[in-house]
């Protein structure tokens, strides 16, 4: 298979790599159908991401189609299922993990940052990180699940609810996702940015 590998700032090469294989009972192998390019990917591309080491396959937003599963994972996933991925790799045993705060796991790593990511043709990971998408979800929608999940968490932690005033600083992808969810929850949203184009997009 092919993978786009960041070998140095501003340098990406397409390499041939071995096909991932099902090894564990909870493994899920899927074909990458579409990926997003996040601001952190661009930062890494420019050499400004301090935790990205080269060489690295970037990408942590994707939608894929299941190709093969381990014998335990087949209870939840079947070949042909449309899926997306929760890209955090957690320990499951630290204090935050034990209390449902896996986003701040003491030992967390990220696909596409600390581990190779989705700018490749096939990917394998544990079923814990896989989310099956319902029928009717487009590839574009599936790819945006990860940033919308970030926005949903932000809106919930901010207490966005009917009649509450919420200020969002920054109208990029995450800011816009947060704004849409806050509005859907009934909040009054003020979003700020220094770029007129982003504000226009948020207004639309």
Which positions does each model-derived feature cover?
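Cytochrome P450 core scaffold surrounding the K-helix E-X-X-R motif
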Residues: 40-46
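Residue-level recognition of beta-strand termini and adjacent short loop/turns
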Residues: 8-10, 24
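Short Gly/Pro-enriched turn/cap motifs at secondary-structure boundaries
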Residues: 7, 19-20, 53-59, 111-115, ...
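Cysteine-cluster motifs in flexible loop/terminal segments that predominantly coordinate metals
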Residues: 38, 87-131, 135
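Residue-level marker of beta-strand positions
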Residues: 61, 81-82, 96, 122, ...
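Nucleotide donor/acceptor-binding cores
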Residues: 1, 26, 163-164
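Mid-domain Rossmann-like dinucleotide-binding core that forms the NAD(H)/NADP(H) cofactor-binding site
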Residues: 137-204
């Amino acid at each position: 298979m092919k993978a786009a590998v960041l070998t140095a700032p501003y340098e990406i090469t397409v390499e041939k790599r071995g096909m991932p294989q099902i090894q564990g009972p909870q493994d899920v192998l899927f074909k990458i159908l579409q990926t997003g390019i996040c601001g952190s990917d661009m930062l890494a591309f420019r050499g400004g991401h301090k935790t990205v080491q080269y060489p690295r396959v970037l990408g942590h937003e994707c939608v894929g189609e299941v190709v093969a599963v381990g014998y335990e994972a087949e209870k939840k996933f079947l070949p042909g299922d449309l899926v997306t991925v929760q890209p955090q790799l957690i320990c499951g045993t630290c204090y935050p993990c034990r209390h449902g705060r896996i986003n701040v796991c003491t030992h967390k790593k990220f696909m596409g940052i600390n581990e190779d990511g989705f700018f490749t043709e096939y990917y394998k990971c544990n079923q814990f990180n896989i989310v099956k998408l319902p029928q009717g979800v487009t590839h574009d929608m599936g790819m945006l699940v990860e940033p919308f999940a970030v926005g949903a968490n932000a809106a919930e932690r901010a207490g966005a609810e009917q009649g509450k005033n919420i200020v969002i600083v920054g109208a990029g992808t995450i800011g816009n996702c947060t704004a849409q969810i806050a509005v859907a929850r009934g909040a009054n949203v003020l979003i700020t940015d220094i770029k007129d184009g982003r504000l226009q997009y948020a207004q639309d």
